[in-house]
Structure formats: C-alpha cells, structure tokens
From Swiss-Prot:
Homodimer. Optimum pH is 6-6.5. Keywords: Antibiotic biosynthesis, Lyase. It is an enzyme of class 4 (lyase). InterPro entries: Dimeric_a/b-barrel (IPR011008), Polyketide_synth_cyclase (IPR006765), Polyketide_synth_cyclase_sf (IPR038474). The keyword DNA damage does not apply. Pathway: Antibiotic biosynthesis; tetracenomycin C biosynthesis. Changing H51A: Relative activity reduced to 16% of wild-type. Pfam families: Cyclase_polyket. Transmembrane segments: none annotated. This is Tetracenomycin F2 cyclase. It catalyses: tetracenomycin F2 + H(+) = tetracenomycin F1 + H2O. The lineage of its organism: Bacteria, Bacillati, Actinomycetota, Actinomycetes, Kitasatosporales.
Amino acid sequence: MAYRALMVLRMDPADAEHVAAAFAEHDTTELPLEIGVRRRVLFRFHDLYMHLIEADDDIMERLYQARSHPLFQEVNERVGQYLTPYAQDWEELKDSKAEVFYSWTAPDS
C-alpha cells in the first residue's frame, strides 16, 4: 500500500461494536473500491477512535467527492451518532486526519 490516512476522533468504547458493524456492512458495497480503499482498520484506545485507511494512491479527493453519494451518507450518519471530533476546532474530514511526522522502512523492503 502506497497511501495511508489515519483519522482520529472520540468514541465511547462501548460503541465500538456499533461502529464496526456499520463499516462491516458498508465495506460490502461498491463504494470503498470506487474510492480506492484497499484496507480499513479501526482501533480504539480508551475514548480515542482511530480509523486507518490504506490505498494504492492518495484518495482524499475521491473521498471528498463521495460525500454526496448515498452510501457514504448512510455510513456517515450511522457512525456519526457514536463519533465526535477530537479537536474542538474540527470543521471537516481533513481536521481529523493525523499528520505523519516520522516514518521508517527497512532497507530490504
């Protein structure tokens, strides 16, 4: 995978099953592949929710374009009742994207 995006939000740990179920259903639709998502991994740590998206290339533009798609709106509405922004100044999707500040790759990779 050449591209990764890590989104960070807040979530009550008790709601993890609901969020996972929403994405499990969503990932059976055509939309993730249309956007270019190759892998999705959800993490939780106390009240933090981390959403790792992996793709072959940068998908953020396609992700923004998909916001008007009914399947995107459906999953967003479902998980939106369980997730809240981490940052108080959150305005849009990109405001929850973690910034890479160090990366290492083994020489033989």
